[in-house]
């Protein structure tokens, strides 16, 4: 910010934002509580603004009901039939449909079909990919993950499970 002698204030322009074009690359694939997560964009790609990943969920699968402290989520169903719980109600969404689940609101999703569902998910701000990476380490090689460890990892990333 600068000023001159006539008391007029002049604001300096904001620094230019960086942009990224990501050519086709193989996504990093992680397992998170039975879901396959394919990371496409991370905070490193977007200056921490958002993350983008694909979630593939087995029939009947989905996370426990939970609340995020840090990020909002947008889901776009590519394949399958998915039920979203938010605001105390379930809504069924098919291919081409989307759901917005803001931070601070208890929510979950469940694959309602008899084949794997596929969703493109955005989270903002970025960082949720770090949760998946740590959770994948906890779940690696385990038939059923240690839920105490899952809860601890989740809490470190601002995710809390509710009844």
Put a short name on every predicted segment:
Residues 1-50, 141-163:
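A short, N-terminal "cap"/entry segment at the start of jelly-roll beta-barrel domains
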Residues 23, 74, 81, 88-106:
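Short acidic-glycine-tyrosine-enriched beta hairpin
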Residues 33, 59-61, 82, 100, ...:
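Hydrophobic small-molecule pocket/channel-lining residues, especially in calycin-type beta-barrels
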Residues 36, 59, 70, 89, ...:
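A generic "binding-loop/recognition-motif" signal
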Residues 36-42, 53-68:
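Conserved short histidine dyad/triad with adjacent acidic residue
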Residues 45-48, 57-61, 74, 81-82, ...:
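Short, charged/polar surface micro-motifs in flexible loops or helix N-caps
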Residues 46, 83, 103-129:
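Ligand-binding loop in jelly-roll beta-barrel domains
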Residues 114-150:
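A contiguous, mid-protein "functional segment" used to position or interact
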């Amino acid at each position: 910010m600068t000023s001159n002698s006539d008391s007029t204030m002049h604001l300096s322009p904001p620094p230019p934002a960086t942009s990224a074009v990501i050519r086709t690359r193989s996504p990093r694939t992680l397992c998170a509580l039975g879901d396959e997560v394919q990371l496409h964009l991370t905070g490193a790609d977007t200056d921490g603004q958002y993350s983008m990943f694909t979630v593939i969920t087995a029939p009947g699968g989905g996370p426990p009901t939970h609340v995020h402290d840090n990020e909002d989520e947008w889901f776009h169903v590519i394949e399958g039939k998915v039920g979203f719980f938010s605001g105390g109600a379930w809504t069924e969404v098919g291919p081409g449909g989307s759901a917005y689940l803001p931070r601070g609101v208890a929510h979950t999703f469940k694959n309602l079909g008899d084949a794997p569902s596929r969703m493109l998910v955005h989270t903002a701000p970025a960082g949720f990919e770090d949760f998946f990476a740590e959770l994948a380490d906890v779940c690696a090689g385990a038939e059923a993950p240690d839920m105490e460890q899952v809860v601890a990892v989740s809490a470190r990333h601002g995710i809390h499970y509710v009844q």
